[in-house]
């Protein structure tokens, strides 16, 4: 049996290790390295990005899994002998299927938290880096990091001895002089600058160890851009490291190549091969290389992937300046949830979130982030409540024993605990890692939750939902056998009285002939939908329910064969499907709309905005108002606005006189693609 002690033994003649505290100070305040014994996930995709993507084709050809659960066997903190750039050699032991449960136990890592020692970093100015000049020491550093200076002497002066990352001692003359008086390093500083080849923009780090010893380290500045391809996008943020210590990514390949030149493609392929085969392996990590950590604490990954990420979620993320002098939080919004590289890594959560920022100018090149690097602020997409009608009392829905409620939107296709389901078996048996939780909830609760926000989630067209809201890998679970009849569904949205049973009866389940049509009750009085009221004008009250039921049943029969609610077929943005979606969703409740008002929807949106048509006099004014509301050129709107006519067919705005249009239109839909102009038959 291989033990951690055996794995941790360094080979004879191994490179000299750096003091851990000094290493962390040089790496940056937000850099984290998992301690020995910690459970981590190793991401080969992130490792390839760390190596400038040199071995990505070889990894994809070898069918390396998206992530491998491991335990840290040893960590060696080291520094480049020429540049002083710090890096770590991390030895990992993959966990087998029988040990997958151990990934939850991270107790060994919790005990290795150390108090950070006093340290200070300063970016060198042109004066500091001049040959023959001195170093201006900030007062905080001189009084808290350096040994105490005897201010009674004239002038106050002392010799400061500091050891670098290689253990070499450097002597500096520390003096307090000038007008105004300031702390300076004079004699010995020029030698240090010349030997270390420091330039303006580099940072110097002073640290006082636990024993009182003084240490000095270096953080090299990134040297511009070199163009050419690489594994990451080029950064153009002056002063800001694109991913800080938390997520140093999307920086210039040329700038990062200085520290990552030793991450060879063959080493990357070998590490991935050993990891896939369940053998111990070693990786080299450069914390200043402007890419995220690819050995991530398992607890952080699992916690992040339990969140049901969807567009519109608000989050915050920490960034630090390139010299690691300060850390700031930036707010952002999830724009989409999709795999970053579906060809090579189709099941990888690495950089799963495509994001937009509240301050896009500062973070213009940070387009994708991994879920475990952000902190969720709001799980509900931002909704403009001003466009909704005033809250109304929620009528209760009649209970029908033959229609059991189903308030569940959709279930994930991935197990809640992939490790417990044999996540890592080697030999390429690696299911996707998306442990979203079960989101089932009582129908009454979900109905109340969504009553004042328009259509309930259970009434939305699921193929539309999969393509626009959820991660593409999610699908409706196939609980129904080939010959069994699934349980029918009924809408849990208490504000929708005109939902056709075509969506309520899933997979063509038939409703008994003697069943009463669904209705709404408010204070003991039945509430009729507009369609039921229109039918009651020409038929007797006793026949009203049957007429409505027959109409809905016929409509359900015509749509049953193409029900996209349960089908797992991929969603196509064709004209016919868009028209079908418009027809299925055009029966939005008109309760609360005054005469001359309507709801306006962007195609595939489930939340509309109110528009007073009575205040408009022509289609030109209509297009102008819509252009202001949605920031779309009015000329493009002429062929993109659809509405439902009196006879139920979908028409273009402008097919009827504007006076008739005002009377009939209760829902407008703006197509996002001009090519979907085909209304079909």
Swiss-Prot record:
Region of interest (Disordered), ranges: 474-518, 534-577
Comp. bias regions, Polar residues: 534-555, 564-577
Gene3D superfamilies listed in its UniProt record: 2.30.30.1040, DNA-binding pseudobarrel domain, Phosphatidylinositol 3-kinase Catalytic Subunit, Chain A, domain 1
Keyword match rRNA processing: no
Keywords: Auxin signaling pathway, DNA-binding, Nucleus, Transcription, Transcription regulation
Cellular component GO terms, alphabetical: nucleus
Residue spans binding DNA: 120-222
GO MF: DNA binding
Keyword GTP-binding: no
Domain named PB1: residues: 595-675
Pfam families: ARF_AD (PF06507), B3 (PF02362)
Tissue expression per record: Expressed in roots, culms, leaves and young panicles.
Subcellular location: Nucleus
GO biological process: auxin-activated signaling pathway; regulation of DNA-templated transcription
Listed SUPFAM superfamilies: DNA-binding pseudobarrel domain
Function in brief: Auxin response factors (ARFs) are transcriptional factors that bind specifically to the DNA sequence 5'-TGTCTC-3' found in the auxin-responsive promoter elements (AuxREs).
Assembly description: Homodimers and heterodimers.
Family statement drawn from the similarity comment of this UniProt entry: Belongs to the ARF family.
UniProt free text on domains: Interactions between auxin response factors (ARFs) and Aux/IAA proteins occur through their C-terminal dimerization domains III and IV.
Name this polypeptide is given: Auxin response factor 8
Gene designation per UniProt: ARF8
């Amino acid at each position: 049996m291989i033990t951690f002690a055996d794995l941790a033994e360094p080979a004879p003649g191994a490179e000299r290790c750096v003091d851990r505290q000094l290493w962390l100070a040089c790496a940056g305040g937000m850099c984290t390295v998992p301690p020995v014994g910690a459970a981590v996930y190793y991401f080969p995709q992130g490792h390839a990005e760390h190596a400038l993507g040199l071995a990505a084709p070889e990894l994809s050809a070898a069918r390396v899994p998206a992530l491998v659960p491991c335990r840290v066997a040893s960590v060696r903190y080291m520094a480049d002998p020429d540049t002083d750039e710090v890096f770590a050699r991390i030895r990992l032991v993959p966990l087998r299927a029988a040990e997958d449960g151990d990934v939850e136990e991270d107790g060994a890592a919790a005990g290795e938290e150390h108090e950070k020692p006093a340290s200070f970093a300063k970016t060198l100015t042109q004066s500091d880096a001049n040959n023959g000049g001195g170093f201006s020491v900030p007062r905080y550093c001189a009084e808290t990091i350096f040994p105490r200076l005897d201010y009674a002497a004239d002038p106050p002066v002392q010799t400061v001895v500091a050891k670098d990352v290689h253990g070499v001692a450097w002597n500096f003359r520390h003096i307090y002089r000038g007008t105004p008086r300031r702390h300076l390093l004079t004699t010995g500083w020029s030698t240090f600058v010349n030997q270390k080849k420091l330039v303006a923009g580099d940072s110097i780090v002073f640290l006082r160890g636990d024993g009182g010893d003084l240490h000095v380290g270096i953080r090299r500045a990134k040297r511009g851009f070199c163009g050419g391809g690489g594994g990451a996008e080029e950064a153009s943020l002056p002063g800001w490291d694109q991913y800080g210590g938390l997520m140093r990514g999307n920086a210039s390949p040329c700038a990062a190549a200085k520290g990552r030149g030793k991450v060879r493609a063959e080493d990357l392929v070998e590490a991935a091969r050993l990891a896939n085969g369940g053998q111990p392996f070693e990786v080299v990590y450069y914390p200043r290389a402007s890419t995220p950590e690819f050995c991530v604490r398992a607890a952080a990954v699992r916690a992040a992937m339990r969140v049901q990420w969807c567009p519109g979620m608000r989050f915050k993320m920490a960034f630090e300046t390139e010299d690691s002098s300060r850390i700031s939080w930036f707010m952002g919004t999830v724009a989409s949830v999709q795999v970053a590289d579906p060809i090579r890594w189709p099941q990888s959560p690495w950089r799963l979130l495509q994001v937009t920022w509240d301050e896009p100018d500062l973070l213009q090149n940070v387009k994708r982030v991994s879920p475990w690097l952000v902190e969720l602020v709001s799980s509900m997409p931002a909704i403009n409540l001003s466009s909704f009608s005033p809250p109304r009392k929620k009528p209760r829905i009649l209970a029908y024993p033959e229609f059991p409620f189903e308030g569940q939107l959709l279930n994930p296709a991935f197990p809640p605990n992939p490790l417990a389901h044999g996540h890592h078996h080697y030999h390429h048996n690696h299911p996707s890692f998306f442990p979203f939780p079960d989101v089932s909830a009582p129908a009454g609760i979900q109905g109340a939750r969504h009553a004042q926000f328009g259509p309930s989630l259970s009434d939305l067209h699921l193929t539309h939902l999969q393509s626009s809201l959820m991660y593409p890998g999610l699908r409706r679970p196939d609980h129904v056998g080939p010959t069994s009849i699934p349980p029918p569904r009924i809408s849990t949205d208490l504000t929708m009285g005109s939902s056709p049973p075509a969506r309520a009866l899933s997979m063509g389940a038939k409703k008994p002939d003697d069943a009463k049509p669904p209705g709404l009750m408010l204070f003991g009085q039945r509430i009729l939908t507009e369609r039921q009221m229109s039918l009651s004008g020409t038929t007797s009250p006793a026949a009203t329910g049957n007429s409505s039921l027959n109409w809905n049943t016929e409509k359900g029969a015509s749509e049953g064969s193409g029900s996209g609610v349960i089908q797992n077929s991929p969603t196509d943005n064709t004209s016919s499907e868009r028209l079908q979606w418009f027809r299925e969703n055009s029966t939005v409740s008109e309760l609360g709309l005054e005469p001359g008002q309507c709801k306006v929807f962007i195609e595939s949106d489930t939340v509309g905005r109110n528009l007073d048509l009575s205040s408009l006099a022509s289609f030109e004014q209509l297009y102008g108002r819509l252009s202001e509301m949605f920031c779309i050129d009015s000329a493009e709107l002429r062929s993109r606005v659809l509405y439902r006519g009196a006879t139920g067919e979908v028409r273009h705005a402008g097919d009827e006189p504007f006076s008739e249009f005002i009377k009939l239109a209760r829902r407008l839909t703006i197509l996002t693609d001009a090519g979907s102009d085909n209304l079909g038959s």
